[in-house]
Amino acid sequence: MGPIAPEQPPSMPATASAACRAEGWTAAAEANSRSLIDPAWAPFGRPEAGWEIYVALIQHEIGTGCPANSEGFAAALGAWQGVNGQGGDGVVSEPVFLALKSVVQTRREFVRATASGACPETPDLITAARLKEGYGEKQVWMRPRALDAYRRMVAAARAAVPEAAADPEMLTIFSGYRSPAADAARCQADGNCDGIVRARCSAHRTGLAADMVVGHAPGYTVDSSADANRLFMTHTATYRWLLANAGRFGFVNYPFEPWHWEWTGEAP
C-alpha cells in the first residue's frame, strides 16, 4: 500500500513554531518525518502505510500539540518513552507505537474483561436512544447509564465545537448494542468472523459501545475503515475534541476506529 492521498488539510505545517523547537532532537524529528507515511506495517493486523493516521492519538498520549515532524514532538515522545520503559530516542517505531497502543487499549474495560478468552454476557437492561440520536434516525440501543453519559458528552461537544454544533449528524450513533446473534449473522454474511471488521466477541454486545459519526471523507461512508477515510476523521475537530475530553465522561476509544467509543462506567 502506497502513501495515502487524502482530500483534507495537511496533517502538519511545513515548519514548526518556535515553541516546538527543542535542542538535541533534530535527528529524531527527521526520522519521524521520513517514517510518517512510508513504512509498511500492521499494528492492528491489517497492512497500513506509515503512522499519520495515529498522529493525533500520539500527540494526545504524549501531551504535545507539536507537529509530528518537529523537535518538540520528538522531545515529548522521548519523555513518554522514558516513563514507559521504551528508551527515550524520540523516534516513532513499531515497538514504541505498540507500547503506546497497549496503554490505550488496556483502558478499555472490554479488553481487560476478554483478556482471558472469556466473552461478556449481554446486559439485562438496554434502553432505546431517541431517534434523532441515531444516524439517519436509525433506532439504536445502549445501557441506560451509558446512554446518559453519551448525551452529556454530546451536549458538551456541541457547545465547544462549532463543527459538531452545525451538523446535526455529527456524533449521532450508527451502531450501539448489537446482539450476539445479529453479529454472528453479519460476520457469516461478510465472510469475516475473526478479522477487524467483524469479531466473534464484539464490544457491541455489552451495550456500552457506540459507533459515532466523526465525519467522513468525500466518497466514503461514516463507517468505512479505508485508510483515507480514517485519516480524514482524525483531522476533524470533533474527533480531536473527543480525544481530549471523552475521558471526562467515561468514554475511551478503540484507536483503529476513530468512530468507536466505549463507556467504562460499568463492567462489561
Q: What is each PLM-predicted segment?
A:
Residues 89, 111-112, 185-189, 223-225:
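Short, solvent-exposed loop/turn and secondary-structure capping segments
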Residues 77-80, 171-177, 186, 210, ...:
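Long, contiguous hydrophobic alpha-helical segments, chiefly transmembrane helices and signal peptides
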Residues 158-191:
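Extended, low-complexity, intrinsically disordered C-terminal regulatory tails
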Residues 1-165, 180, 247:
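Cell-envelope/ECM-targeting effectors and their regulatory/trafficking segments
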Residues 65-73, 167-172, 228-239:
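Glycine-rich, flexible loop segments associated with nucleotide phosphate handling
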Residues 149, 182-186, 208, 238:
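Amphipathic alpha-helical interface surfaces
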